Amino acid sequence: MTEIINVTAREILDSRGNPTIEVEVAVGTGDVGRAAVPSGASTGEHEALELRDGDKGRYLGKGVRKAIANVMDEIAPAVVGLDAGDQAVLDQRMIELDGTATKSKLGANAILGVSLAAAKAAAQAHGLPLYRYVGGAGARTLPVPLMNILNGGAHADSNVDIQEFMVVPLGAPSFAEALRYGAEVFHALKAVLKKKGAGTGVGDEGGYAPNLASNEEALALIMKAIEQAGLKAGDDVGLALDCAASEFFEKSSGKYDLEGEGKAFDGKGLVDFYASLAAKYPIVSIEDGCAEDDWATWKLLTERLGSKLQLVGDDLFVTNVTRLSRGIAEGVANSILVKVNQIGSLTETLEAVRMAHRAGYTSVMSHRSGETEDTTIADLSVACDCGQIKTGSASRTDRVAKYNQLLRIEEELGKAARYAGRDAFRALR
């Protein structure tokens, strides 16, 4: 019934105007699944390879015609005839066809597009929403949105070093109300920034991208916005940071250089910096607080703050079970960021989430800075029981599309729906 009968691919544009790949998989029932692959701005060194053309005369070298050719000429002949409902077999066939550790032969973007499109086709053929098809009958937990309302680092042209400042509506009674909390703080922050004379242009993920005196000033302004929105910081809304520390780590000196505020720290100094922020503000989560291969400072950070805060590994783990298993064994971090294109297949993504949950780590489903209207990660956040999702601010359709899909899922679940709230954060339980 769900035998794959056709695979096609095309080049489309993502939210930054760069090409990406979109794949359609058709099955014997006549159902067709479609998936568009996202792309990151700050990418970890250990991520699966996103295959680009490299032709500087076309899309500045960022075209994906090579990946499309690999889908049409290599992957399609190998998967036509397979059952789209047997995700593990399908993904393993593509992984073996590629034969490299980082999917560099065919491209992780090519493999992932087929992987996700096949899952969608199978879900449609079975008459099930994607979250139910992947997650089963127990999939009913709506995630807490970690809403990136102020952008810095690689996501903005500003002097703010920390990449994302997020509001976390952990005290809301439902996802719909959580989204309202976040949107109202987002709008309040615009008024706060305007009053200060700061810019209100937005970055890649829809958050404001002003020039500020320091990273701490960003937190102070968000606290003011929470208050002006009529909400209580710490109870209704917490704060979260994505430091993307690999972006400001100087390998030659071993120092973390916060250029925007003229400070440089060694590992211990950086941990002290985070501890001082956490003592002053209701921060519930810090992502990529240390560089991706600075395991010693990660260990120090976990020992210092791991019992109080969620410490999320993004570039550290890259949704890879090998790196995650090392982190678990060494007691590093306590949460994993889940990005489907970091590893390049749905099966491997699900394996990483299962490993994290077995070890008592939390998981956060995440978008990339280069997104499309595709809403797959919204369904996957519910299917995987992540309890948290990062998909940008309350602006830009590529971000809001995921939130709107979660609103639909919550409505469809009705009284069975459960909003994760504070329970999504191990340290707050």
Curated annotation (Swiss-Prot):
Q: Which residues bind (2R)-2-phosphoglycerate?
A: 163, 339, 368-369, 390
- Record keywords: Magnesium included? yes
Arranged from A to Z, the UniProt key words for this protein are: Cytoplasm, Glycolysis, Lyase, Magnesium, Metal-binding, Secreted
Leading EC class: lyase
- GO MF annotation terms: magnesium ion binding; phosphopyruvate hydratase activity
EC numbers for this chain: 4.2.1.11
Location relative to the cell: Cytoplasm; Secreted; Cell surface
Cited Gene3D superfamilies:
Enolase-like C-terminal domain, Enolase-like, N-terminal domain
Its annotated pathway reads: Carbohydrate degradation; glycolysis; pyruvate from D-glyceraldehyde 3-phosphate: step 4/5
On cofactor binding, the record's note says:
Binds a second Mg(2+) ion via substrate during catalysis.
HAMAP family attached to this UniProt entry: Enolase (MF_00318)
Q: What is this protein's function?
A: Catalyzes the reversible conversion of 2-phosphoglycerate (2-PG) into phosphoenolpyruvate (PEP). It is essential for the degradation of carbohydrates via glycolysis.
Name of the protein: Enolase
Per the UniProt record, the source organism is Anaeromyxobacter sp. (strain Fw109-5)
